[in-house]
């Protein structure tokens, strides 16, 4: 289950949600919607979204989550959230088919999961947050980066952690059957016989039935067309190094990235960050970790 943790931290009159999400998986949609409904009903005003281990996944699921985080008025207008940029030939093919390369914020979404269609009503799952704290690392990539890039024009986002991976592109899986059967159909439309012309490929299933390729065919931009630098990832507003071998579990207020986010959100009664931790070796040694300085911005960031 990629929806690993969901919590609400309360202090004074403030409620801040925390969601640890590890993959944009179509099977996680119902759980995501349920969590967002809970946050909405509990009156969460800000969200800490932990994407430090999220390498990406399905772009439609990313669109679904964005539609529950973006301001409700933008979702109601179906505003553009992301743009996909393909090569000119594919863009022309999309134009001729009347299809769009834009992803929109939506209050209702349809997805196909294992051949079964699902219709999700998100109208009562939009949390209504005013600020998003994104916890990231070098493992944060692809759909995770797209989510933050697409939401930036709509939402106050503070990125905490380390520079993300920098995979600002997407594509699709092409199986051997997809390729061969498409070629067979193409030949047939031209009045030709694929297997007669290529008898050596007649038994392709014997050799490559389980093969496939992941084909990159677009990069993404925000609604204004701003394109990320492919040579770099997203730089954090507040640089904090993850410490996965600390004694504190994910979700604990003393865990380094969550501690930083809660500090930035204004929580003042946090426990001390001075900890002792086990190393990876069974013959462990004690490691002293310094206290996080919540006011230290990374040099060169706004």
State where each predicted segment sits:
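Short beta-strand/loop segment at the start of cytosolic alpha/beta domains
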Residues: 1-20
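C-terminal "post-core" interaction segments
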Residues: 16-19, 23-48, 55-302
């Amino acid at each position: 289950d990629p929806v690993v943790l969901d919590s609400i931290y309360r202090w004074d009159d403030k409620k801040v949600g925390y969601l640890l999400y590890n993959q944009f998986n179509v099977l996680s949609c119902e759980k995501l919607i349920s969590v967002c409904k809970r946050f909405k009903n509990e009156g969460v005003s800000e969200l800490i979204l932990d994407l430090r281990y999220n390498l990406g996944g399905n772009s439609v699921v990313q669109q679904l989550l964005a539609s529950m985080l973006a301001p409700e008025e933008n979702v109601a207008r179906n505003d553009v959230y992301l743009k996909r940029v393909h090569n000119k030939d594919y863009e022309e093919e999309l134009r001729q088919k009347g299809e769009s390369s834009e992803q929109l914020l939506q209050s209702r979404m349809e997805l196909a999961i294992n051949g079964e269609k699902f219709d999700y009503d998100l109208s009562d799952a939009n949390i209504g947050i005013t600020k998003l704290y994104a916890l990231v690392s070098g493992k944060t990539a692809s759909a995770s980066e797209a989510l933050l890039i697409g939401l930036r024009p709509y939402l106050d986002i503070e990125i905490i952690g380390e520079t993300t991976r920098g995979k600002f592109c997407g594509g699709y899986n092409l199986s051997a059957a997809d390729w061969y059967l498409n070629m067979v159909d193409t030949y047939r439309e031209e009045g030709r016989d694929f297997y007669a012309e290529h008898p050596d490929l007649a038994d392709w299933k014997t050799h490559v039935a389980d093969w496939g390729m992941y084909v990159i065919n677009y990069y993404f931009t925000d609604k204004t067309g701003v394109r990320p630098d492919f040579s770099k990832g997203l730089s954090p507003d507040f640089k904090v190094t993850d410490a996965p071998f600390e004694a504190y579990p994910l979700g604990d207020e003393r865990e380094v990235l969550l501690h930083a986010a809660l500090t930035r959100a204004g929580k003042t009664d946090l426990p001390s960050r001075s900890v002792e931790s086990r190393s990876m070796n069974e013959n462990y040694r004690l490691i002293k970790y310094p206290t996080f300085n919540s006011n230290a911005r990374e040099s060169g960031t706004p």
